[in-house]
Amino acid sequence: MATPGFPSTEQRLGLYPVVDSLLWIERLLAAGVTTLQLRIKNADDAQVEQDIVAAIELGKRYQARLFINDYWQLAVKHGAYGVHLGQEDLEAADLAAIQQAGLRLGISTHDEHELAVAKTLRPSYIALGHIFPTQTKQMPSSPQGLASLSRQVKNTPDYPTVAIGGISIERVPHVLATGVGSVAVVSAITLASDWQRATAQLLHLIEGKELADEK
């Protein structure tokens, strides 16, 4: 049985960093990022809950859209803004409980079939990926490319869309040209030689925020 639909979010979420630590959440909120995701891997349960609680508090303090990856029970328990789930997590998660708690839901998709499945669940946004090759995580699927992204965006007018996977600063203009509403990045910020500068450039490209004058 389909869920009755999840709370809506902005049609264009803008820059959407996906990070793995509370430190990065703090840094990026202070840098002006308003949509972000905490994706914790390989941590013990007590530390995970502690970090999620702290991240949710920070998100509320900055009035940001903070999504918790995977740990939907903790997100519900502590009143997160939203949850992000991969396709492999959908069957195990209690989607009705997430919806009844008033949390937003984002869902990952990797092809047309998964996109169709996501639409039946009426989430708050749909992530489309991976667009380019990525070293951030092992992917069983092949990169979709810009042509596929453009087609999927056009076929998904009723949902905010997020492009993810191997998106560098240089690739952002081409990704935005597809009409996608948000661009998720990982290593473009976390592996940058100057993460603050990289974040400012991405905010400028994606959201039109002014860059500080060069000295």
UniProtKB/Swiss-Prot annotation:
Pathway: Cofactor biosynthesis; thiamine diphosphate biosynthesis; thiamine phosphate from 4-amino-2-methyl-5-diphosphomethylpyrimidine and 4-methyl-5-(2-phosphoethyl)-thiazole: step 1/1
A Pfam short name: TMP-TENI
Gene Ontology MF terms: magnesium ion binding; thiamine-phosphate diphosphorylase activity
Entry's EC annotation: 2.5.1.3
Organism superkingdom: Bacteria
Sites where the protein binds 2-[(2R,5Z)-2-carboxy-4-methylthiazol-5(2H)-ylidene]ethyl phosphate: 134-136, 166, 186-187
UniProt cross-references to InterPro entries, sorted A to Z: Aldolase_TIM, ThiamineP_synth_sf, ThiamineP_synth_TenI, TMP_synthase
Binding site for 4-amino-2-methyl-5-(diphosphooxymethyl)pyrimidine: 37-41, 69, 108, 137
Cofactor(s) essential for the protein: Mg(2+)
The keyword Signal appears for this protein: no
Gene Ontology terms describing biological process: thiamine biosynthetic process; thiamine diphosphate biosynthetic process
Binding site for Mg(2+): 70, 89
Reaction(s) this enzyme catalyzes, per UniProt: 2-[(2R,5Z)-2-carboxy-4-methylthiazol-5(2H)-ylidene]ethyl phosphate + 4-amino-2-methyl-5-(diphosphooxymethyl)pyrimidine + 2 H(+) = thiamine phosphate + CO2 + diphosphate; 2-(2-carboxy-4-methylthiazol-5-yl)ethyl phosphate + 4-amino-2-methyl-5-(diphosphooxymethyl)pyrimidine + 2 H(+) = thiamine phosphate + CO2 + diphosphate; 4-methyl-5-(2-phosphooxyethyl)-thiazole + 4-amino-2-methyl-5-(diphosphooxymethyl)pyrimidine + H(+) = thiamine phosphate + diphosphate
Keywords per UniProt: Magnesium, Metal-binding, Thiamine biosynthesis, Transferase
Enzyme class per UniProt: transferase
PANTHER family tied to this protein: THIAMINE-PHOSPHATE PYROPHOSPHORYLASE (PTHR20857), THIAMINE-PHOSPHATE SYNTHASE (PTHR20857:SF15)
NCBIfam families, per the entry: PRK03512.1, thiE
Protein task: Condenses 4-methyl-5-(beta-hydroxyethyl)thiazole monophosphate (THZ-P) and 2-methyl-4-amino-5-hydroxymethyl pyrimidine pyrophosphate (HMP-PP) to form thiamine monophosphate (TMP).
HAMAP family for the chain: TMP_synthase
Protein name: Thiamine-phosphate synthase
